[in-house]
Amino acid sequence: MADKADKMKARLPRGFVDRVPDDLRAAEKMMATIREVYDLYGFEPVETPLVEYTDALGKFLPDQDRPNEGVFSFQDDDEQWLSLRYDLTAPLARYVAENFETLPKPYRSYRNGWVFRNEKPGPGRFRQFMQFDADTVGAPNVSADAEMCMMMADALERLGIQRGDYAIRVNNRKVLDGVLDAIGLEGEGNAAKRLNVLRAIDKLDKFGPEGVRLLLGKGRLDESGDFTKGAQLPEAAIEKVLAFTAAGGADGAQTIANLQAVVAGNAKGEEGVQELADMQALFFAGGYEGRVKIDPSVVRGLEYYTGPVFEAELLFDVTNEDGQKVVFGSVGGGGRYDGLVSRFRGEPVPATGFSIGVSRLMTALKNLGKLDVSDTVGPVVVLVMDKDTQNLGRYQKMVSDLRKAGIRAEMYVGGSGMKAQMKYADRRAAPCVVIQGSQEREAGEVQIKDLVEGKRLSAEIEDNVTWRESRPAQITVREDGLVDAVREILDAQARDRAEQSK
């Protein structure tokens, strides 16, 4: 026996999670529904590897000798740096560039998979998580961006989220660029200050207009006494930015009119507003008014995107860790990224896409009761009473017959006795067990114990009359009638579940 001190400690790395069967089934059920919508729109699946050359990812390269800030990186045997992908978009850009001549343009694809971030983990922040993306590469017109928004709205509704409980919010990088240019922040030399402005606007939901005003100016002192330095804009520039964030109107037409007034005279800003107007016309024509909204307060990701940017937000309340009611918030986002594929091609390649945070959307659906996998039926367990080779073969035949009939089934392969086997079947959520001892075998029979009915009877039946009138929890049938008898039990249980769910 190994010394206790030599035992390896079983421990999960920080920032990672194990996924149990219910979570896996729930995720697959949700993603299958999303795939149905994306397929309906004519998008095709594609899969890229988890590992890419680090320079193909492009975003995180602070140190060429050790480029693992933000990503998990390693060197291969020819000393080239490789990294685990941090999103699904950069690998898609590489794939499209590498196969550009053979792919149809526009190229419409979707993919789901794990992504990795080499960042400090915390509550709700993991180093490995799943995304589900859809992208169109090679479409310069904003009709492709509008389609992304409409497809996301349809996916949320197909998942059971009602109208009024979600909104796809849309903005345009060019509009904000027009505002920033108008206040003197044009050009790469002002990149840091532009980013500070974006970060300030992103706090609008959290701090309100006055909080954003402070962050655009000298800075903001919070309740704990911490001071956040502001963007140091002059008062006139602050008013211009706040006018942009407050441009949202009663409907899309009013919002667009307000934005036109804010960027009047700036060509880039006016181009962005026109793109929003074109998208709004498509939303109206498709019947998506109220579901997809033009919203100037959307700034998340604007430093990355080159045109329209969109965010899927769930509007219902949930209780946070402090017991407070809060709006659930974002479950995905995207936008136009015309520069990403162009890095490989040396020529303009327009692209737009949308990414769903799978775990976050799963949490939302569970809160709404829209992702119930409790109807998953465990396997029928054939108990093993005699372990000699000949009788094991008989048990194996029973299992095979059940499986051929499309019934989940397993033969107990442990080494324990009858009591432990019954406990095992209960922990496996088995709907019933099959028992054949020597007496049943000689008679050519099997016993089938309905575990679901047995639990119900033991909890509910108080007198012998009721017991006799109930469906019996254990029956004996001919061996050749096993499959039919098990199917009858499973069908009865399914009817009971359906009745209880009404």
UniProtKB/Swiss-Prot annotation:
GO cellular component: cytoplasm
One family name in Pfam for this protein: HGTP_anticodon
Subcellular location: Cytoplasm
UniProt keyword annotation of Nucleotide-binding present: yes
Quaternary assembly: Homodimer.
Annotated PROSITE patterns: AA_TRNA_LIGASE_II
GO-annotated molecular function: ATP binding; histidine-tRNA ligase activity
Stated name of the protein: Histidine--tRNA ligase
Tree of life domain: Bacteria
Alphabetical UniProt keywords: Aminoacyl-tRNA synthetase, ATP-binding, Cytoplasm, Ligase, Nucleotide-binding, Protein biosynthesis
